[in-house]
Amino acid sequence: MRDGRIPIVLGVTGHRTLPDEEMAEAAVRKQMQALRERYPHSPFAILSPLAEGADRLVARLAIDVLGADLYVPLPMPEDEYRTDFAGEESQNEYDTLRKQSESVFELDIDGAGDALGLNGEARNRRYAMAGAFVADRAQILFAVWDGADAAGTGGTGDIAQWALNGHVPPEYRLPEARDRPFYYPNETELVHVHAETG
């Protein structure tokens, strides 16, 4: 909370590789400016795991355009998570945004049932559960994707549908979903920015 005001909670899901990042940035910026006009006196918070691509783009713009507070839910221990970043430039981009965050926290995914590993399908499941966490808590979810169905369970298309339907499948929902910060028992508004056409 900022000055006692409860923030509007934004979330992000999207592709790690954006076909036209400049176009996506312009489209997201336009949507955020519209949010600022629609809610001129409200503070904002952004939930973003800061994966490459859409996560970082939306987080950066939420900070720049809306003055949003950044919260970073991680799907696994941070040292392990960073191994998914492409190189030094990506590591530096992550570090720059991380320094601007209010909080970086590892989700209690292992507490959701059997301990998951960190490789293969178990790793993908961790990402899906992080996406579910964001979809479960965002009042407005920015989905920067091509509109296609998810290639595997828990991809961008699934996360967007979970938010729209107001229902995350039980196997992806963290057990503390209803008693942690950023949980609001209402419908999520989805802002779809087409990854290829804006």
Task: Tell me what each language-model feature is.
Residues M1-G198:
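Acidic/glycine-enriched connector segments
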